Amino acid sequence: GNKIIKIMDLAIATGVPMIGILDSGGARIQEGVIALGKYGEIFKRNTMASGVIPQISIIMGPAAGGAVYSPALTDFVIMVDKTSNMFVTGPDVIKAVTGEDVGMEELGGARTHNQTSGVAHYLAEDEVDAIDYARALLSYLPENNLSETVVYAAEGELEITDEDQKLNTIIPDSPNQPYDMRSVIESIVDGHEFLEVQPLFAPNILIGFARVDGRSVGIIANQPQQMAGTLNIEAGEKAARFVRFCDAFSIPILTLVDVPGYLPGTDQEWAGVIRRGAKLLYAYAEATVPLVTVITRKAYGGAYIVMGSKQLGADINLAWPTAEIAVMGGQGAINILYRNEIKAAEEAGEDVAAVRARLAAEYTYNVASPFLAAERGELDGIIEPAATRISVIKALRALRTKRSSLPPKKHGNIPL
């Protein structure tokens, strides 16, 4: 314990990242309160280091009992498939207390924490893969909150390329047909390289690091291929934590939006989507780093506001001509706005589907058009999809000297 505490103090004092490699059964039972006290001192230092230096935990074996809280307090947790385990209470104790039969892998294995709990951020194939991912993460991060990320010499080309042109045809004709947002991300970033974080957890939202114009950026994007890109509790919490990490270490954030709204259902409401969904709103509103947002297709209701909107403090908001920005989608809106016309069409024996399609198209043109939002100052520009990469480069260049501060306070009260 003393050795760990000493190196943690040194990392904080010298402003260098801290990496923990864990393979521990927990506290030594025979040492009693002394061992527990050392864990408490480690947890406190994890907390003091948060937002000061990057902290990465690599789990290469068991991490049980109190030992799991140290990696939980770090920024990134990497687990090795079929080797790592994390749990507060082990299978034997669970069996004795509740009668429930569960194996170590199912209870707290690497796949469980990557897919189900969201505790882990990367599922490594083996220990070498885990270390390689940690190295890749560090390449995008500064040494501490007062230093800058490494800037690579390669600057972005400011002419539309053949690769850029592919974005002009990526949005399907049907608004209900999905597409892969990763393709959009890879077309914007340097070298088409996107280091995704938590790819298996809440896959309806993508988060990760890349470089644009040779500089590190954090990217948050809805994924239409998963749950139509809707926001749910897990996606909101995943993105909120990532926004706060990027803000703590002065990494600009690029947000790509295609969100039809929040996932409806009693499960979400009863699990606290109001409180827990507000975390992402809070994170964006509190962030002072450069914020650039591009709406590719849908941006409806409260989800539009939450996803890096101008109202929450985004610096530059752009949209493709295919964008739809409104309180709700066309089909839902016409049920309320044009219920009498639809009822009259039914009574007259008209083609109701054709009437609904016409009314929805009128609603989209008259209410949800991005050009209306641009006219009212809610957007800073409508851009050709092929020009996205160039527009993002120009926006981030303009924001390099951004200075912003929050009202003086001890700390805010995020809805945890």
Language-model features: where?
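Ligand-binding clefts of soluble mixed alpha/beta catalytic domains
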Residues: 1-416
